Each structure stands twice: as structure tokens, then as C-alpha cells.
């Protein structure tokens, strides 16, 4: 199993991956798919469907250098042609582990991961401020 596929396995175990065409379609329509992965030997129809899922969104779709059987083996299935990773940081780590030059996708995911990090910091600061002030009270 390659490094990239290890990240897919880890994402599945952490609940950060959607596997198969219907779940990937649902998560991308909801705008929550950071990275859509398509196996190298997946059909043209599957590739077109994946591209249509992310069309008009800021989600990234790539073909990875792994077969359906290799992707399936990584997550404990027979075969897997399409998957989506929902966490930008996990998607970024996986993309960095994959061979090949994917500069545009890396930049997009880096921006998404930075936005998520900033949002989490703001949420933490807000929660800390609410605790210090004793919470919101009605008069």
C-alpha cells in the first residue's frame, strides 16, 4: 500500500472519507468534499460523474495512480473507484504523499486548510470569552 492510500485508509477509520459514487455525490453536493479521488482504471463515466460533482465548486477532483483493486484493498473492500475526503488537512496530507505534480490542487487545499484552522482558532477564542464573562444572561 502506498503512502497516499494509507491516508485514505486513515481517513476512513477517522470518519473523514465517503466511499462510493452515491455518498461522494451527496457530500460534494453539500459542499463538504475537500478532495475527490478517482482510481486510475475507473471508467470514463465515473470520471465524468466525479467531475460533474465538483463542477462549479471549490472542491478538487483528481485521478490517483492506484487501481480500483488497490483503493479497495486500502479500505478493506473488493474494489473502490471513487472516494471523497472531507477534511482539508487530511486531503492535503494525502495529496502531498501522492506522486506527480499537482500544484494547483495543492494551493487550493492549502487555502482551504488555512481557512479551517483560522475558523477553529476563532471558535476557541469565542468559547474562552464566553466562559470568562460567565455566559450570556437575560435581564
Describe the predicted segments one by one.
Residues 56-86:
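Mid-chain, well-packed structural core segment of small domains
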Residues 22, 41, 66-69, 88:
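Short, ordered loop/turn segments at secondary-structure junctions
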Residues 77-114:
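C-terminal structural segments of small proteins and small subunits
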Residues 51-56, 99-100:
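Short, solvent-exposed amphipathic alpha-helical segments in soluble enzyme
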Residues 111-139:
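Charge-patterned, long linear interaction tracts outside catalytic cores
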Residues 33-34, 40-47, 51, 60:
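N-terminal positively charged helical leader segments and presequences
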Residues 4, 20, 46, 67, ...:
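Helical mechanochemical/support elements of P-loop NTPase systems and associated helical scaffolds
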Residues 3-38:
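N-terminal first-folded block
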Amino acid at each position: 500500500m502506498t503512502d497516499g492510500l494509507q491516508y485514505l485508509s486513515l481517513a476512513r477509520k477517522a470518519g473523514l472519507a465517503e466511499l462510493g459514487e452515491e455518498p461522494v455525490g451527496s457530500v460534494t453536493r453539500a459542499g463538504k468534499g475537500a478532495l475527490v479521488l478517482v482510481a486510475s482504471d475507473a471508467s470514463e463515466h465515473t470520471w465524468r460523474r466525479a467531475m460533474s460533482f465538483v463542477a462549479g465548486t471549490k472542491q478538487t477532483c483528481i485521478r490517483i495512480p492506484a487501481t480500483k483493486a488497490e483503493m479497495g484493498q486500502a479500505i478493506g473492500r473488493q474494489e473502490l473507484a471513487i472516494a471523497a475526503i472531507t477534511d482539508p488537512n487530511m486531503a492535503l496530507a494525502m495529496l502531498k504523499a501522492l506522486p506527480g505534480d499537482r500544484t494547483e490542487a495543492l494551493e487550493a487545499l492549502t487555502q482551504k486548510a488555512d481557512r479551517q484552522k483560522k475558523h477553529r482558532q476563532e471558535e476557541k477564542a469565542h468559547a474562552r470569552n464566553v466562559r470568562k464573562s460567565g455566559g450570556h444572561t437575560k435581564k
